[in-house]
UniProtKB/Swiss-Prot annotation:
Keywords: ATP-binding, Chaperone, Mitochondrion, Nucleotide-binding, Stress response, Transit peptide
Organism phylogeny: Eukaryota, Sar, Alveolata, Apicomplexa, Aconoidasida
NCBIfam families tied to this protein: PRK00013.1, PRK12849.1
Disordered: region residues: 636-700
SUPFAM superfamilies tied to this protein: GroEL apical domain-like, GroEL equatorial domain-like, GroEL-intermediate domain like
Protein name, entry field: Chaperonin CPN60, mitochondrial
Record field: compositional bias (Acidic residues): 644-700
Any Pfam family: Cpn60_TCP1
Family: Belongs to the chaperonin (HSP60) family.
Source organism of the structure: Plasmodium falciparum (isolate FCR-3 / Gambia)
PANTHER family documented for this protein: 60 KDA HEAT SHOCK PROTEIN, MITOCHONDRIAL (PTHR45633)
Residue stretch of the organelle transit peptide: 1-9
Length: 700
């Protein structure tokens, strides 16, 4: 009986334990809603961890590629790196030299590629990843740009000549020769050769001379040459030529009444948002004064009216202060007003109709009502870097004719030769007008390529009118070699270095050391320049498919008079001038001058400092989105992320992360309300930052 009671008691206790134990377990177990919330929270936290790891991975790669200090290169290595960049530009640009020059295709970020043979445009588009070599590229771009700005042509010849002189000079410097006397020899040879070329020049006299220069400069396009020659034939040597696009496939020449003068845009910021290298406004008003505009208040009444009416305004003055320029530029950049500023540095332009700014400021009320009567106006205004063209309205033809008659009367009365020349130029400019060449083409690419040719040809003619012309095809360069001009240069060097009784010169000789060594090195520099003059003719022949070395030998060994050369179009040796193959003297001089200048600078460059940049070691790993990325990324980049945790702890943490991610991938959950998510994100961000700092140590 007793045992039975004990048995019953145990059964009751067991049942009670089962009952209450199940209840506790049930209470401790979360319901479905809580479990969804917890799992979603864990998923969000781990996604933030992965996102944070991605972000730090990218930051780490960006940090690797950031510039860290400077690389400093000395001596021969420095010059050799510059030479590689110079030769890179030369090897590309020289392919376009001559009437049989090849084309170069330029890839554009948008639109179809551009196929051209314009040397300066090709050089501008060359850029190398290697910073050291790219400095050499920039030097070549500077050389070609100067030739293009000063002479309008000869950029391909400049690039080739610069590379040749630089290469020969560096070869001598690398043999431990002193570059300073070599530089002196190069500079002296450059000056003497330029003077020699000027003595060989022939002035422009006839229509045929202009036609020949324009044809050669436009890559032997006779039709282009005729259009340009016709423009100069009608308007004279001071002709203003404007290039524009034509909807037709053919080129067209038009003449309009207008006036142009050699003054251009005062500040490049005025070109902002114009998408071209000049500004063109229609129905523009002009304010002309012979005063300096030093205070913005003096022209404020005009600016307010034109800003309100959104009309373009051109201000032509003697000079502008920095304050006025800054104010005008800022307002133009904001789009508040269309304004142009042109500096004349001269008083004649407004001697008759110039506006008195003091009277303008004192009579603001009257100006508000009749401002147009105080200002000039033009149908079209085109302002380039160094030239302004005003196309007048038909209604002003009577006033223009009256002004021309006044100038003619002044021309007859004056006795000064200088005044007669200037008055004649003004009469021609007012009466001649402006030539407008409308350029056609079968495609946009062809149209742009033809426009580059027209620019070269018009610039070449303009420079030739100033100095004259010489035989083309590189014959003038070969004449320097053929006439044994190097002996005159050597003689000049010896005369400059000969010993005299002058104490100052004796001290100089003591400083430079061996006189014979100094003399020989200067002669070496002169020899480098003269021996490089044949590369132009060689390359022209090579581009035409002929052996350039043989062509040069035949010309140098010929007993014909100056002008004998090779015509690649007919494959015959002819008199270049008689065949119309001529070059602008200014172009030839510019090639010699700029080539020797850049080469001299490179030879005396002993050190180069460039930004140091690490090479990119790869791109973002695609496995970054995989479940195993956390542990893989941590092991691979552990040493780069400055993580000092123990290896065992790393493995445990990575395994926990992987387990959490695997669990999360098995379930899909619904989105909750936006307010709840924002609250969770705020809390989780703090938790994540703490966990990232404590567990992964990324932010150190």
């Amino acid at each position: 009986m007793r045992m039975k009671r004990i048995h019953i008691l145990f059964v009751v206790i067991f049942l009670l334990c089962l009952r209450y134990g199940y209840s506790i377990k049930k209470k401790r177990s979360p319901n479905n809603k809580n479990r969804l919330f917890i799992n979603k929270r864990l998923k969000y936290i781990n996604s933030k961890i992965i996102s944070r790891r991605k972000e730090n991975y990218v930051k780490m790669k960006m940090t690797e590629n950031k510039v860290k200090g400077k690389d400093i290169i000395y001596g021969n290595e420095c010059r050799n790196e510059l030479l590689k960049g110079i030769l890179t530009v030369s090897d590309v640009v020289k392919l376009t030299l001559g009437p049989r020059g090849r084309n170069v295709l330029l890839e554009k970020e948008y639109g179809s590629p551009l196929i051209i043979n314009d040397g300066v445009t090709i050089a501008k588009n060359i850029s190398l990843k290697d910073r050291k070599k790219n400095n050499g590229v920039k030097l070549m771009q500077e050389s070609t740009n100067i030739s293009n700005d000063k002479a309008g042509d000869g950029t391909s010849s400049t690039a080739l000549m610069t590379a040749t002189i630089t290469k020969k000079g560096i070869e001598q410097v690398n043999r431990n020769h002193n570059p300073i006397p070599i530089q002196r020899g190069i500079q002296l040879a450059s000056k003497m050769i330029i003077e020699k070329i000027k003595s060989l020049s022939t002035p422009i006299k006839t229509y045929k001379d202009i036609l020949n220069i324009a044809t050669i400069a436009s890559n032997n396009d006779v039709h282009m040459g005729q259009i340009i020659a016709n423009a100069y034939d009608k308007l004279g040597k001071n002709a203003a030529i404007i290039l524009d696009d034509n909807a037709d496939i053919n080129d067209k020449l038009e003449f309009t009444e207008g006036y142009n003068f050699d003054r251009g845009i005062i500040n490049p910021y005025l070109l902002y948002n114009e998408n071209k290298d000049y500004i063109e406004y229609s129905n523009v008003s002009t304010l002309i004064t012979d005063q300096n505009i030093d205070n913005i208040q003096s022209i404020l009444p005009i600016l307010e009216i034109f800003a309100k009416n959104k009309q373009p305004l051109c201000i032509i003055a003697d000079d502008f202060s920095n304050e006025v320029l800054q104010t005008l530029i800022i307002n133009k950049l904001k789009g508040a007003i269309k304004v142009l500023c042109i500096v004349t540095n001269s008083k004649y332009i407004s001697a008759d109709v110039g506006l008195d700014l003091n009277n303008l400021h004192n009579n603001m009320s009257s100006f508000d009502n009749n401002y147009l009567s105080l200002l000039g106006s033009a149908n079209t205004l085109i302002v380039k870097k160094d030239r302004t063209s005003l196309i007048t309205k038909e209604e002003y033809k009577k006033e223009i004719d009256e002004r021309i008659n006044v100038l003619k009367k002044e021309y007859e009365e004056t006795t000064s030769k200088y005044d007669k020349e200037k008055l004649n130029e003004r009469i021609a400019a007012l009466s001649g007008g402006i030539a407008k060449i409308l350029i056609g083409g079968n495609s946009e690419t062809e149209q742009k390529e033809r426009k580059f040719k027209y620019e070269d040809a018009t610039n070449a003619v303009k420079s030739a009118i100033d100095i004259g012309y010489v035989p083309g095809g590189g014959v003038t360069y070969l004449e320097i070699i053929k006439s044994n001009f190097i002996q005159e240069i050597h003689k000049k060097i010896e005369e400059d270095l000969q010993i005299s009784s002058n104490n100052d010169e004796k001290k100089y000789l003591e400083l430079i050391g061996n006189l014979e060594s100094e003399m020989e090195l200067q002669k070496m520099g002169a020899n480098i320049v003269v021996s490089s003059l044949d590369v132009i003719t060689k390359q022209i022949a090579d581009n035409a498919g002929v052996n350039g070395d043989n062509v040069v030998k035949i010309i140098l060994n010929s007993k014909d008079k100056y002008g004998f050369g090779y015509d690649v179009n007919t494959n015959k040796f002819v008199n270049m001038v008689e065949k119309g193959i001529i070059d602008s003297t200014n172009v030839i001089i510019s090639v010699i001058k700029n080539s020797c200048s850049i080469a001299s600078m490179v030879l005396t460059t002993e050190c180069m400092m460039v930004d140091h940049e690490k090479k990119d070691k790869g791109i973002l790993d695609s496995s970054i989105n995989s479940p195993n990325y956390l542990s893989k990324h941590r092991r691979t980049y552990k040493h780069k992320l400055h993580d000092d945790e123990d290896t065992d702890e790393d493995d445990e943490e990575d395994e926990d992360d992987e387990d959490d991610e695997d669990d999360l991938d098995d379930d899909d959950y619904d989105d909750e309300d936006e307010e709840d998510e924002e609250d969770e994100e705020d809390e989780d961000d703090e938790d994540d930052e703490d966990s990232m700092n404590d567990e992964y140590n990324y932010d150190e």
